[in-house]
C-alpha cells in the first residue's frame, strides 16, 4: 500500500490563498484537506481545495458524536451536494477504510460501501 503524505492543512490553505484568494473552504474540515485541485468550471480553470471524503465524514463523526450513517447523510446533502460557484471545493474518495469508532465500535468498510 502506498503511504499518504499530505502537507499540513495550514500550508495548503496558505498556498491556495496565494493562487486563488476566492477559493472556498468547508467549515471545520481542515484536517480532511488533502491538497489543491485544478478544475474546469464555467469556461475557466480554477484552483480549489480538495478534501478527503473519508476525512470529512470522520471529522463529522468526531465533532458531532454521530454514527457513520448520520455523518454520511449530512455529508451527502449538506457538503458534497452544495455547489456555491466556481470556487466550491471538491471531495475525493480515497477508497480507504474509515478508521473511526463510534462508542467503541469500529466502523467497517462494508458499512461505507456496497460491495
Describe the function of each predicted region.
Residues 2-115:
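C-terminal alpha-helical interaction appendages
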